[in-house]
Curated annotation (Swiss-Prot):
The keyword Nucleotidyltransferase does not apply. This is GMP synthase [glutamine-hydrolyzing]. It holds the Pfam family GATase. It comes from Aeromonas hydrophila subsp. hydrophila (strain ATCC 7966 / DSM 30187 / BCRC 13018 / CCUG 14551 / JCM 1027 / KCTC 2358 / NCIMB 9240 / NCTC 8049). Pathway: Purine metabolism; GMP biosynthesis; GMP from XMP (L-Gln route): step 1/1.
Amino acid sequence: MTKDIHQHRILILDFGSQYTQLIARRVREIGVYCELWAWDVTEEQMREFNPSGIILSGGPESVTEAGSPRAPEYVFNAGVPVFGICYGMQTMAEQLGGKVQSSTEREFGYAKVEVLGNSGKTSALLRNIEDAIADNGNALLDVWMSHGDKVTTIPADFTTIAQTATCPHAAMANEAKRFYGVQFHPEVTHTRQGARMLEHFVKDICGCECLWTPATIIDDAVARIREQVGDDEVILGLSGGVDSSVVAMLVHRAIGDRLTCVFVDNGLLRLNEGQQVMEMFGDHFGLNIVKVDAEERFLSALAGEDEPEAKRKIIGRVFVEVFDDEAKKLKNARWLAQGTIYPDVIESAASKTGKAHVIKSHHNVGGLPEEMKMGLVEPLRELFKDEVRRVGLELGLPYDMLYRHPFPGPGLGVRVLGEVKKEYCDLLRKADAVFIEELRKADLYNQVSQAFAVFLPVRSVGVMGDGRKYDWVIALRAVETIDFMTAHWAHLPYDFLGHVSNRIINEINGISRVVYDVSGKPPATIEWE
């Protein structure tokens, strides 16, 4: 009998750290299922979840301030291992009888942690982990710190297992109860041995089996889809993006031709994208796809509108209308498949303290009219984006499609600045295709996180041969980022940029000038609109 891939599970309580989702991704990478909940979870909810272990995340608040978040008391009475990270360690120490105070010496960035005494051999968390050896024989670890407060007195029955020059209790442990705390962040790559610490906690201390893999995720999703929809038919809005493509493959594997994919060509796609989607999913994979040519409908709705948020809302509204029209033709479709992923679920979860993330509006079919009365099939709702990509590879989708740069939901509608016209979209499509083609040829595409062209609705004088021309301007944008929350503009070679500019101006009639965007985020956003 196949094992339940959710059988061993870790609960991560979120105290507001920017790295909390990273903790969950690291646990998943180990091969163990986990969920991320707000810190104010009830005992009943935790009992129902029945975790094999609990991780307390970092957070921006101070344990020394009244009203700051605390872990539910049940965390320390549940009889399972607990791992406190940064703020998580501080609230653990304070709640179990230790002391925390604000420090005059804040630690931000790299630090060297010394593993004390015999802890490098006896501590289940830090056993046999080292980056270097100190003169006294103790293990040294390169870690990433981000804290102002620090633990000054550890609780009774705890021992200090690591320290820094300014932080006397950089890590603490109660080996009998399997409680551990570290003042640094093992989830970030800057902490070189962080993945091994998390693996020690999840596998060795919590005893979790590695049941969470792309292959087992697929088997589980297929079984769930079959159980959920029975003999009914399913409809899916297929965009050709990563999420909807993986959903299409999963649902098709589960129910075959009872899935109908609706591909809406809104006239705001990249060059030849509609043709590529139809060839890949229709011809190659044999999915049942209905293609709707709705370019005129979208462009008519956008005519005269130049405000970015209004354009986004128009594109979202018209998509819903077009999709609704097609769905009504499929009389037997009882279910709607969507590409909701786990970060969407997290961001939409409201904490009773009001400290959860804000709900995002997505440009998918989530806003379909209530009268459609369809059930939702969301096979990716437990997965992070990197997991979706790995599942896609396992399903046979091409690497280049799964790992291509992000493309906004409204498409070229927010890369044509101001009013959107067919002429502008056609010029932008061609310029963008040249830029991406040259990035790939120069082996630069995978060295930047996102690259694209932007159409600027301004004319500029140019010289072609013996004549002058007065044509449009294209901006090129390329950024390097880890999380898309902040980004640096990519320092592409001057010769490369010159070559791309020459190709765009010489090969695309209607463009007279190319500029390169050297703005970081912040203060600028990655997209121009």
